Amino acid sequence: DIILGNPPDIPEVTMVHLPRVEATLAPLALLTKTVWLPWIKLEKPDARLIRLSEKNNNWTFNLASDDNKDANAKPSAWSFRLDNILFDQGRIAIDDKVSKADLEIFVDPLGKPLPFSEVTGSKGKADKEKVGDYVFGLKAQGRYNGEPLTGTGKIGGMLALRGEGTPFPVQADFRSGNTRVAFDGVVNDPMKMGGVDLRLKFSGDSLGDLYELTGVLLPDTPPFETDGRLVAKIDTEKSSVFDYRGFNGRIGDSDIHGSLVYTTGKPRPKLEGDVESRQLRLADLGPLIGVDSGKGAEKSKRSEQKKGEKSVQPAGKVLPYDRFETDKWDVMDADVRFKGRRIEHGSSLPISDLSTHIILKNADLRLQPLKFGMAGGSIAANIHLEGDKKPMQGRADIQARRLKLKELMPDVELMQKTLGEMNGDAELRGSGNSVAALLGNSNGNLKLLMNDGLVSRNLMEIVGLNVGNYIVGAIFGDDEVRVNCAAANLDIANGVARPQVFA
C-alpha cells in the first residue's frame, strides 16, 4: 500500500491511497540521463480532495526545496519521461466547504479512447488546436451547494492534464432534481483551471432553480431550456469571467436568444448582456410578478414549493400576492437589456413590442425605461423598487400616449363605435413586497386626457350607472356622442382613487 497523507490542518489523515502500483522502466534511457517510464499502472486509486476555505486545501503543495532554491544553480542534467498512466477503477471524494460540495466520483477506463470530434459532433470541422481523446468515463453522486446531484461524463487521459498548450477534453450530463446541466468542450491549462470553452445546455422547471447550482440570481419562470457556448477565463485570486455566448432556447412557449456575461468579484458579482424574444408569450412573464403562466404553471409551482415558498392567491383577488424575493437581490448586480418583438396575448390585452433595461445594484432594482406598444399607442415607464428597504419601497412614473379607445377593449361591443385617443400620466408610490401590497397602499396622481372622440351614448349611460337610459337606448337604438375634449385628474391615497377634476 502507498498512502499520501494530508497536511496537519486538514482533518482527515489520508489524501491518496494506492493499494498497488506497477511500472516499467526503460533501462537504456538511463545512459542518456533520462528516467523513462513507458507506463505506470495504479490499482484502484482512492483520492480525497478537501477544501476548507479559498486558501486552504489539500491539493496545493509547497515543496520544501521551493523556498531554498539557489537562483544560480544549474539545472539538473537528468530528465523524466512518463508516457502513460493506467488504472482499472478510481474513486475521488470531494469535500468542498466553499461550494458546499460533498461528491463521490467513480472513474473507469472507457476501454477504447473516443475521439473528441466524435463525442462533440465537430467531426470534419477545422480545428487548429489538437484536442486529446476521451479516455475515462465518470459517474458522480452527492450534493452540490446543498442540492442533490447525479451525473455521468467523460474526460481525457491523465497525461493530457500536464500539457499547458493542449486543451483537456471534458463532457458531462448532470441532474439536480428536474434541473439538467449538460456540456462538452475543453478546459484550458487544466492544472491551473485557467478557463473553459464549452457547449453548455440548461433545462429545468424554472430559471430560479439555477441559483442553487450556479450562484447566478435569475427570476422564477415557466419551464425553460437553453443551448449556447460558454467561454470562461478563471482567476480565483481576482475575478473570473463567464461569457455565455449566442444562446438559444425557450421559456414556456416563448423563444429566447442572446448573450450574457457573469463576472465574479467584489463587492458583488455582476450579470450583463442582451436578451431577445422574437415571439414572446406574455403569460410567460407572469411568474416574474406572481401570475400563473398557464403552460408549465404546475412545474413552476413545484419549483417554488421545493424552495419552501408558499404562494396562495386569495380568492376573489386580482392583483398578484406572490412576494418578491428581495432578500436575494443583494447577492449580485445586473445590467441587462431585454426585447420582446412579437407579443402573443389574449385578444383582450392589445400589447405589442416590449423592451426594458434592467439595472440591479445593491438590492436596488430599476426598469429604466420599460416600454411597450398598447392599443395603437405607447406606454413608457420608469419603475424603481428599493429591495434593500423593509418593507420594499416602490415608485412608478408612467406615460401613456395616443392610446386608441376602440383598441383598448376590443372584446367590448359598445367600444367598437368609439373613436378618439387617450393620453395620460401616472405617478405612484407604495410599499410592500408584492404587486398587491404596492398598489393596495399606493399614493400618487393620475391624469387622463381624451380629445376629438366619438363615444357610444349607451356606453356613457353605463359608465354613469344610468341603467334606465341604457335600456331605452338598447331598445330604440344607440347614438354616438362627439367628445371634443375630456379630462380627469385623480389623486390616489392608500390605494383609493378620488377624482379632483372630471370634465
Can you say where each PLM-predicted feature lies in the sequence?
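Short, highly charged
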Residues: 332, 337-378
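Secondary-structure transition motifs
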Residues: 2-129, 144, 271-331, 453-478
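Hydrophobic residues on conserved beta-strands that form the core of alpha/beta folds
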Residues: 1-4, 18, 37, 42, ...
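Residues on the solvent-exposed faces and adjacent turns
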Residues: 6, 25-27, 44, 51, ...
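Amphipathic hydrophobic-ligand
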Residues: 8-25, 37, 97-112, 145-156, ...
